[in-house]
Amino acid sequence: MDKNTHSSGSVVQAFGNLLHVKFDSPIRQGEVARVIVGEESLLGEVIEIAGDIAKIQVFEDTRGVKFNTPVHFMGHLLEAELGPGLLSTIFDGLQNPLEKVADATGVYLERGIYLPPLDREKKWDFTPLAKPGDVLKRGDSIGFVPEGRFRHMIMVPFSHFGKITITSIA
């Protein structure tokens, strides 16, 4: 298990992209799983749990998966990243930007390829809505970033507890 792994298990049955996996510690429905096939790591999602067996739907070709293939459970649910650049990009079901995947691998989507969904290098204009002295709580808007006619609201994360006092705007 690596440092990002919450729990682990191994494949006991495979039916196409549906795997039955015996696991060793608590997991939850909807949790992200990584199926390790040689050097590749295939993404899947826990869709059902019965006792110590989880059914995992793998989102790509499961060639090479066999009895005892290791599976790592990541401790978080499948999620999509939101932000500027989302509206101007075409994605696959795992939120891989297809144009960048094609640049990296050619016209055929290779399994085990996961690219960041949003461009981390592009600079975006930020318009603050909060002012110095404002006290914000989770879910409150700090400001926005325009993308075309759409405004991406930048908010205090819902994972933040307590209040934030704005001291200055950069």
Regions found by a protein language model. Give the residues of each.
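Peripheral, non-AAA+ core regions of ATP-driven protein-machinery
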Residues: M1-A170
